[in-house]
């Protein structure tokens, strides 16, 4: 039976459908990685993490930042910096830990990703959602597709 390490919640909704859909993909991906680890499929979990968490998150971040820039979101630079720090942390610290470390190291990295995503969606992402709503800006973009 599939388990969830992170459960999607209405509390995560930004009010921007495309971004909420992208966040749901990231949440599902972390749950898929968790289940692959529990099934002893560490190599598949690693590949999924690289393909979806690293690559898809980068596309998602770019999408968010482009929309924020287009509409003049005032906290764009801070938000962009948060994304840059996350990507750098994943590439420089988590990926080597996952590649070379034990299963516990992998699980620790996964816990970090869950915590970061939860906090990031619940705070800075909700903040931009509220800003767009206050300004009466409706985003009609489609969610970035999975490769």
UniProtKB/Swiss-Prot annotation:
UniProt-listed Gene3D superfamilies: Hemerythrin-like
Any one Pfam family match given in the protein's UniProt record, by short name: Hemerythrin
Keyword Secreted: no
Keyword annotations: Iron, Metal-binding, Oxygen transport, Transport
Signal peptide positions (record): none
Keyword Kinase: no
PANTHER family to which the protein is assigned, alphabetical: BACTERIOHEMERYTHRIN (PTHR37164:SF1)
Role, per record: Oxygen-binding protein. May be involved in a storage mechanism or for delivery to oxygen-requiring enzymes. The oxygen-binding site contains two iron atoms.
HAMAP family in the cross-refs: Hemerythrin
Assembly behavior: Monomer.
Similarity remark: Belongs to the hemerythrin family.
Name this polypeptide is given: Bacteriohemerythrin
Species whose genome carries this gene: Methanocaldococcus jannaschii (strain ATCC 43067 / DSM 2661 / JAL-1 / JCM 10045 / NBRC 100440)
